Every structure is written in C-alpha cells, then in structure tokens.
C-alpha cells in the first residue's frame, strides 16, 4: 500500500489529490490558490470535512510545504515518508515526450523549454516539480503529459499548411491537449457501450473552461481541436479558439493598448471566449442566467459557443467517416444539460437524439434515445486518477 499525490500546478495555484494505491482510494484533495499573494487560500477536503485557511504563500515551495503539513495536521498522513510518489500534470510535452516519464533534471529543463507551447500552464508545472523535488527528494516524481495521447496523429493532420522549414527548424505543428482526459473517457465509454475500444469510433468533447474535441479511432487520437497551443479550437471560457491570424497585426496597428503580438495573445487567452463576448462571465452558469434574463450579450456568447463546438464535432464525423458515440466530459460537458441538448439538436442529421429525461444535471451514462443511431454519453473525467496510475506503473520499472 502506498500514497501518491496527483498535482496540477498553475502559475498561481496548486491543485492536488492524495490516493491510496493500488486501491485507487481518494484520501484527501484540495487546492492552494493565489500563490504569490498575501491572501493565499488553502482548501483541504477529507472524510467529508472541508478546511479553508487564508495565509501568505509566496511561492510554490511554500505551497508544497503547506500541503504536506496540512496532511499531517489533519491526520491524513503521519510523516512525509508515507508519500511514495507524486505525479505532475504537464500540458505541453512537445515532441520530447510521447509517454509519461520519471522526472530528472533534464525533464524539468525540457518542460521549461516548452513554455511557449503552454504559457499559462508549463511554467507553473515546472515550479511545482522543483518544489516537490526540493522537499521530497527521495520519492518517485513522474510527469504525465496532456499531449502524449495525441502523438498518434499522422503527419498530414498535425502539420500546418505553411513552409515545412517552420516545422523542421522550430517544431511548429499541432500538439493538442487534454489528452489524459480524452484517453480516459474513451476507455470508460467503451465499458459503457460494452464493446472493445479497438472496434469503436468515438468523438470525445472535453468541455470545461478549456474546450477540446478529439476524433478517436479504435482507441487512438487521429485528430484534435487544440493545436500548437491550447488556444486553438472552439470558443472557450476565456480563450477565443480559432481566429483568422491576420487579425493579430491588424489589432496591433489599430489599438494602442495592444503594443505587440504578446499583448494580443494574452487578450485571446485571458479576455476572450464566453467572458470576453458576453462581458458577464466565463462561467456557463452565469451565461445561462443571462439567457433567462434575455441578456443579448449572453445570448450571443452562448450561440457562438454552441456553433463552434458543433462545427468541430461535424468535422470529426467526416474524419472518422461516422462515429459510434459522442462523449461529453469535463465541467460543462458533465454539468450543462442545456449546452448538450443544443449541441446535439444541431447534429440530428448524423442520427443523434437526446432523451430529455436522461439529459439532466448529475446524470452520467447514455443520454440518447433508443432510436439514436449515434449514442450520446456523459462520462466523468478523472485525470488525477490517470496520473496516480502512471506513477504506480513507473515506480515498478525503477524498483
């Protein structure tokens, strides 16, 4: 029996989940937010209890110390020695990493080198890795990459139609993201359908604050909507998704507040999407409240959101030459019945039909009618469990 922590570290946050392995039992979970500020928030959930404290956490090293000390303080572990492994979610692995790896100095350097591919994610993840290696130097640390699952895409799919020297010299290509989630929910969908994954054609829709759609052919990713960075694809919570790239120099020339390409990319990443269009919120619950109030900006943002998701799903029906099931997952995918209904209603030509009695908040499983030719499933993703499993698997290779 061992205890493994799954970590998802951002630039100012550290989300974690502690497992007892191999039983895969969640012992505790939590998040430390506002790292670097004097009013950081540490939240711990365990045994049906919730503890929350506001304190000064200046950096990721102090965040990790706080996490471990909380585990001892609340009696979840006795000593640091009970932690035998830690797994880190890394958004961008580039072409360096086709699978999860045990961390060493070179791995940390490569994660930092790939920051341009995931500027909102990789720097924070690298800081989290360094913090754990400093405080728990003797345990097995593992990196699990969002991009690994998508390394099965063929060259004609992952290359952009620009001169090939930009791929050869600078590795500009589609990498995708959310791969851990897409892989997990495809496996769970196969179990729900009672069929081998290697016989299925699935379209998996990870719809959270970040949104990505993946075409899964017999268990492998053959195309996905996120690209060189997680900015590409459908409209998202704060991200624009795909836009005409000529907009970038145009905006720099027109708007004095946007001084260079970095300013525009920051706007596209953090001030766009549902939040940017609506002017209300990036949270679908707030957008739906705006729909109820007939707020025209909320209606517009919602309609763009649905339209972009439908278009990517339609593309992947063409890529796969049909599909056995459409799978919704992640925050909105699992908890926004109205969004699911409006997406599927716009794809009825493909033979999909939702059962309104099943398409309700909290339901998991098959939400399609008996007559639906393409099944529509809601599957809870569990990226943290996938990370913990990879830690256990790789520990065996070095023991």
Swiss-Prot record:
Signal peptide: none annotated. GO terms for cellular component: cytoplasm. The lineage of its organism: Bacteria, Bacillati, Bacillota, Bacilli, Lactobacillales. Belongs to the acetokinase family. InterPro entries: Ac/propionate_kinase (IPR004372), Aliphatic_acid_kin_short-chain (IPR000890), Aliphatic_acid_kinase_CS (IPR023865), ATPase_NBD (IPR043129). Substrate binds at residue 89. Homodimer. Transmembrane segments: none annotated. One of its GO terms (molecular function) is magnesium ion binding. The record marks 178, 239 as: Transition state stabilizer. Pathway: Metabolic intermediate biosynthesis; acetyl-CoA biosynthesis; acetyl-CoA from acetate: step 1/2. The active site is at residue 146. One of its GO terms (biological process) is acetyl-CoA biosynthetic process. Its cofactor is Mg(2+); Mn(2+). Pfam families: Acetate_kinase. Mg(2+). Can also accept Mn(2+). It catalyses: acetate + ATP = acetyl phosphate + ADP. Keywords: ATP-binding, Cytoplasm, Kinase, Magnesium, Metal-binding, Nucleotide-binding, Transferase. Mg(2+) binds at residues 8, 383. ATP binds at residues 15, 206-210, 283-285, 331-335. It comes from Streptococcus equi subsp. zooepidemicus (strain H70). Its EC number is 2.7.2.1. Gene3D superfamilies: 3.30.420.40. This is Acetate kinase. It is an enzyme of class 2 (transferase).
């Amino acid at each position: 029996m061992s205890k493994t922590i799954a970590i998802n570290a951002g630039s100012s946050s550290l989300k974690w989940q502690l497992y007892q392995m191999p039983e895969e039992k969640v012992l505790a979970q939590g998040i430390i937010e506002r790292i670097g500020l004097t009013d950081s928030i540490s939240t711990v959930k365990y045994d049906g209890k919730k503890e929350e404290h506001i304190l000064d956490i200046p950096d990721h090293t102090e965040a990790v110390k706080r996490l471990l000390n909380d585990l001892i303080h609340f009696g979840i572990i006795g000593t640091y020695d009970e932690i035998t492994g830690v797994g880190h979610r890394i958004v961008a692995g580039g072409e360096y990493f086709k699978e999860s790896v045990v961390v060493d100095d070179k791995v940390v350097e490569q994660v930092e080198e790939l920051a341009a591919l995931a500027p909102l994610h990789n720097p924070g993840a690298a800081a989290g890795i360094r913090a754990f290696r400093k405080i728990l130097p003797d345990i097995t640390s593992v990196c699990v990459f969002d991009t690994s699952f998508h390394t099965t895409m063929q060259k004609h799919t992952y290359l952009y139609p620009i001169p090939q020297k930009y791929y050869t010299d600078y590795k500009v290509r589609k990498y995708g993201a959310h791969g851990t989630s897409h892989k997990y929910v495809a496996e769970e969908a196969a179990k729900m359908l009672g069929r081998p994954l290697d016989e299925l054609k699935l379209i998996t829709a990870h719809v959270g604050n970040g949104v990505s759609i993946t075409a899964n052919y017999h268990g492998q990713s053959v195309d996905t909507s996120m690209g060189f960075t997680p900015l590409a694809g459908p409209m998202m919570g704060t991200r624009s998704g795909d836009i005409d790239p000529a907009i970038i120099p145009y905006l720099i020339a027109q708007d004095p507040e946007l001084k260079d390409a970095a300013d525009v990319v920051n706007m596209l990443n953090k001030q766009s999407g549902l939040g940017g269009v609506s002017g209300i919120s990036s949270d679908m619950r707030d957008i739906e409240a705006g729909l109820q109030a007939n707020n025209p900006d909320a209606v517009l943002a919602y309609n763009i959101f649905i339209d972009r998701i439908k278009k990517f799903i339609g593309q992947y029906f063409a890529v796969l030459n049909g599909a056995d099931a459409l799978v919704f997952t992640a925050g909105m995918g699992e908890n926004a019945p109205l969004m699911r209904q409006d997406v599927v209603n716009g794809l009825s030509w493909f033979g999909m039909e939702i059962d309104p009695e099943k398409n309700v908040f909290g339901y998991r499983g098959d939400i399609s009618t008996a007559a639906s030719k393409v099944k529509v499933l809601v599957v809870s993703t569990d990226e943290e469990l996938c990370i913990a499993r990879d830690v256990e698997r790789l520990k065996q290779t070095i023991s």
